[in-house]
């Protein structure tokens, strides 16, 4: 089976960390040993430095929406070109904590940025590079944020209003409805139920990718 790029998307508190571990377990059960984990923003020294700027800002200086978007895509391009594409080229599978759908949901939905600007930027820097499968963990924002707060201190984006996350979720849901490479999982369920649903969906997808005898 050829190498694939699988991404986990979702709001804060949706359980992405647990889902990623589950994906890696399923892949290894299928005999796929060379699995590379990535996260966005981050994953390279430059991208990690940008992650800190995006999440924490610099002092009291406000971060404009466009500056935030450009930093996210700068980190993303560095990760794609420096880590993801080389890993896929050598035959490894890549499991990502977020990819560009996060920008479409958070910046396009949450921040209300122009969808045409987002698409133009995406096309210019990523072209036709896309994940083979995106598992979207759907959760009501109030529940997800309560889980995130229980983990500890929130970053600059996590302290946005509930309305911001409602808009972000709505955009995620619209993206999922229009993309046959996205699978939606109900992340408001107990962890065991989410894990079972993820395992089922991923196993079915892997079977469909296997070459015909």
Swiss-Prot record:
Binding residue positions for ATP: 10-17
PROSITE patterns xrefs: THYMIDYLATE_KINASE
GO biological process: dTDP biosynthetic process; dTTP biosynthetic process; dUDP biosynthetic process
Record has Phosphoprotein as a keyword: no
Primary enzyme class: transferase
Catalytic activity: dTMP + ATP = dTDP + ADP
SUPFAM superfamilies reported in the protein's UniProt record: P-loop containing nucleoside triphosphate hydrolases
Highest taxon above the source species: Bacteria
One Pfam family here: Thymidylate_kin
Annotated EC: 2.7.4.9
GO MF term list: ATP binding; dTMP kinase activity
Classification via Gene3D superfamilies: P-loop containing nucleotide triphosphate hydrolases
InterPro entries: P-loop_NTPase, Thymidylate_kin-like_dom, Thymidylate_kin_CS, Thymidylate_kinase
Species whose genome carries this gene: Sodalis glossinidius (strain morsitans)
GO cellular component: cytosol
Family, similarity comment: Belongs to the thymidylate kinase family.
Function as written in the Swiss-Prot or TrEMBL entry: Phosphorylation of dTMP to form dTDP in both de novo and salvage pathways of dTTP synthesis.
The keyword ATP-binding belongs to this UniProt entry's keyword annotation: yes
Entry protein name: Thymidylate kinase
Keyword terms, alphabetized: ATP-binding, Kinase, Nucleotide biosynthesis, Nucleotide-binding, Transferase
């Amino acid at each position: 089976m050829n190498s694939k790029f699988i991404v986990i998307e979702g709001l804060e508190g949706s359980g992405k960390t647990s889902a990623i571990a589950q994906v890696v377990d399923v892949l290894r059960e299928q005999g796929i040993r060379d699995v590379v984990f990535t996260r966005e923003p981050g994953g390279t020294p430059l991208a990690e430095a940008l992650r800190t700027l995006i999440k924490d800002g610099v002092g009291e200086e406000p971060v404009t929406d466009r500056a935030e978007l450009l930093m996210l895509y700068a980190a993303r391009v560095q990760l794609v070109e420096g880590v993801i594409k080389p890993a896929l080229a050598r035959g490894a599978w890549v499991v990502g904590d977020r990819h560009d759908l996060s920008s479409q949901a958070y910046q396009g939905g949450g921040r209300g940025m122009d969808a045409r600007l987002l698409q133009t930027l995406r096309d210019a820097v990523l072209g036709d590079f896309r994940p083979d499968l995106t598992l979207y963990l759907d959760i009501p924002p109030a529940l997800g944020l309560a889980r995130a707060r229980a983990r500890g201190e929130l970053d600059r984006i996590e302290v946005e209003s509930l309305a911001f996350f409602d808009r972000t979720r709505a955009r995620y849901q619209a993206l999922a409805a229009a993309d046959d490479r996205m699978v939606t999982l109900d992340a408001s369920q107990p962890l065991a139920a989410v894990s079972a649903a993820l395992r089922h969906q991923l196993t079915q997808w892997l079977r469909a990718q296997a070459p015909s005898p």
